[in-house]
Amino acid sequence: MWLLLTMASLISVLGTTHGLFGKLHPGSPEVTMNISQMITYWGYPNEEYEVVTEDGYILEVNRIPYGKKNSGNTGQRPVVFLQHGLLASATNWISNLPNNSLAFILADAGYDVWLGNSRGNTWARRNLYYSPDSVEFWAFSFDEMAKYDLPATIDFIVKKTGQKQLHYVGHSQGTTIGFIAFSTNPSLAKRIKTFYALAPVATVKYTKSLINKLRFVPQSLFKFIFGDKIFYPHNFFDQFLATEVCSREMLNLLCSNALFIICGFDSKNFNTSRLDVYLSHNPAGTSVQNMFHWTQAVKSGKFQAYDWGSPVQNRMHYDQSQPPYYNVTAMNVPIAVWNGGKDLLADPQDVGLLLPKLPNLIYHKEIPFYNHLDFIWAMDAPQEVYNDIVSMISEDKK
């Protein structure tokens, strides 16, 4: 870690003093902002709330109740809830310019937009009973996000808006917890008007992402390397890279390719001028247990709950010796799916296994040149994805 920091500092000094590695681009103001500040910076109204889950986690939730173009309309607006993916946060939906960020596009289209955060990320790192310094705080995976985080947040939104149903947009792990929650919790599923799944992930049997490589690491060694608390939080080093290293012309492309290695390549569709914003808010962290759960999923090729490591432990949690499988065929929520042909995480083969199991699939589009991150950051995402979502929600109002 210190070696990396030293190298990064050297690059910064050489770049500043001797002009190597190109000019340092002026930083984007959002680099040092929180979610509320990012929203209001662009002139949108913002409301910030804290949602407390049944097991005590405190999640920050943000609301953009209307857009810049329709503030005079005081009537009830359709509610759209956006849920981020793995190692991410609600900033994903507002990191581009307003005409390229889904949250702002939906608000300007006349919708009541809510942004969720999953436990353990930058904006959801508190608990009523446990300190984030404790092992107990980090004893969760996407199982608990589906069981506790989604119901608590959706219930809060329903009560706050007075509307019985909402539209759910999930990206990556945001689709995973949606599949689990809406197939195992029928009362919650009734509150979802339509599920819009971007880069959906259920099984990861064919994934080519870095998670695939981690599957070879035994649990004991995994914990020895990564510990048993937080995995990949955003820290000073990440912020330094974003503002002092990756903002230089010659290193900009190198840094963007580092992101692509994880999720797939599409450099032509990537707005490098926003790279400092992406890197200053990502990764947002999760638990080591959550990452190990994903490695279990790669190994098994199945969509199932976390394996606690022994039949005895599994019986304590599930009343059976093996972790239960998740059955997406039990989810009757109408769902529209978009996936990418070059997605290393949500591999097209895994998506191909998922689609026939969805009993109420209303739309599917595969974008051949899209990778995993294109769905939130691509310059042509409005044309390829977002405009379709807006149209579908609009049709649903009629």
UniProtKB/Swiss-Prot annotation:
Keywords: Disulfide bond, Glycoprotein, Hydrolase, Lipid degradation, Lipid metabolism, Secreted, Signal. Residues 78-377 form the AB hydrolase-1 domain. It catalyses: a triacylglycerol + H2O = a diacylglycerol + a fatty acid + H(+); 1,2,3-tri-(9Z-octadecenoyl)-glycerol + H2O = 1,2-di-(9Z-octadecenoyl)-sn-glycerol + (9Z)-octadecenoate + H(+); 1,2,3-trioctanoylglycerol + H2O = 1,2-dioctanoyl-sn-glycerol + octanoate + H(+). Glycans are attached at residues 34, 99, 271, 327. One of its GO terms (biological process) is triglyceride metabolic process. The active site is at 172 (nucleophile), 343 (charge relay system), 372 (charge relay system). Its main location: secreted. It is found in: Secreted. Transmembrane segments: none annotated. It is an enzyme of class 3 (hydrolase). Belongs to the AB hydrolase superfamily. Lipase family. This is Gastric triacylglycerol lipase. It comes from Homo sapiens (Human).
